[in-house]
Amino acid sequence: MPVLHVDARPGSGPGGVSPPPSGAALARRPGLADTAPFLRACRREHPGTTPVWFMRQAGRVLPEYRALRAGVAMLDSCRDAEMITEITLQPVRRFRPDAAIFFSDIVVPLVAIGLDIDIVAGIGPVVAEPVRDAVGLAALRALEPDDVPYVADAVRFLLAELGSTPLIGFAGAPFTLASYLIEGGPSRDHARTKALMYSEPKLWHALLARLADITTAFLRVQVDAGVDALQLFDSWAGALDEADYRRYVAPHSARVLAAFAGEVPRIHFGVNTGELLAAMGQAGADVVGVDWRVPLDEAARRIGPGHAVQGNLDPTAVFAPEPVLAAKVRDVCARGAEAEGHVFNLGHGVLPQTDPGVLAHVADLVHGG
């Protein structure tokens, strides 16, 4: 599959197409909200077919991605408008999903403000100097649009290429970013994070407020450049019980989501958050992402009225025999139909050993093929 070569000079977009001007009012594509199944489902409508996309659809599951990324560090690929554009488009060509998701990483805005973070293969983000006190907090300056010029450039290039396919922007939620910063990397128990949360609540809330500002600024660049929806990833929120989530986390996620109320649909997703679904919806999401542990009809009941749901096929179901996989896909769709709106997805990201052809088959099954 050919690589898209993007001329990143001012006034030029992929394939010589001039990108649309910056600014949210000009970037929204006329009529898309009324016709795109993904956006209609986010608004709690029931389009003719269930829309589908896959978390981590742009990434290492695709051989063309691995070829493009050969010799290129993850963070470097996230800071190059040409690579962002090509990687975002690769799964759109492969699977014909109902939405594309902007290729990036949740630590990109933290690196952009000067933090020393590396993404280590097989581990994940590793923070050179963990943030555990007021001195560390002081190092977290505000994110400015000029810190991430490649983001707006890539969004504009993508809008010129995607046609009627909506583009989802994304960012990491304050709690998940805080956990990486406090722990110094991924953690099984989030012990340091919870210790700071319980023992120094003033510092904790100051840290999450700062991260909420950074996340909001990162999403603002994407929304103003023209993304059609956004997803707030709170990967580690499932480490908390509901009371702690509501007290220490939800207000900060709510502030991020509130910044985009009425502009674009807002999706809120976390892993192992079955007991937090109502609180995550109340934080201001239009769509609540659900992992595979809770059936979607039960998830919709927990979340309550006024929300669509997204999910939630077990990512390992793609390794099942086809009749088993097809039955599971149909079950997810049937349960999702009980919600006010349903966007089909996996219950977490695509596993790297997944056969891309199976994902294409899942998309066909969801669409009624």
UniProtKB/Swiss-Prot annotation:
Its EC number is 4.1.1.37. GO terms for biological process: protoporphyrinogen IX biosynthetic process. It comes from the Bacteria. It is an enzyme of class 4 (lyase). It catalyses: uroporphyrinogen III + 4 H(+) = coproporphyrinogen III + 4 CO2. Keywords: Cytoplasm, Decarboxylase, Lyase, Porphyrin biosynthesis. Pfam families: URO-D. Pathway: Porphyrin-containing compound metabolism; protoporphyrin-IX biosynthesis; coproporphyrinogen-III from 5-aminolevulinate: step 4/4. One of its GO terms (molecular function) is uroporphyrinogen decarboxylase activity. The record marks D105 as: Transition state stabilizer. SUPFAM superfamilies: UROD/MetE-like. Its main location: cytoplasm. It is found in: Cytoplasm. InterPro entries: UROD/MetE-like_sf, Uroporphyrinogen_deCO2ase_HemE, Uroporphyrinogen_deCOase. GO terms for cellular component: cytosol. Substrate binds at R56, Q57, A58, G59, R60, D105, Y180, S235, H348. Residues 1-26 are annotated as: Disordered. Belongs to the uroporphyrinogen decarboxylase family. PANTHER family: METHYLTETRAHYDROFOLATE:HOMOCYSTEINE METHYLTRANSFERASE RELATED, UROPORPHYRINOGEN DECARBOXYLASE. Catalyzes the decarboxylation of four acetate groups of uroporphyrinogen-III to yield coproporphyrinogen-III. Homodimer. This is Uroporphyrinogen decarboxylase. It comes from Frankia casuarinae (strain DSM 45818 / CECT 9043 / HFP020203 / CcI3).
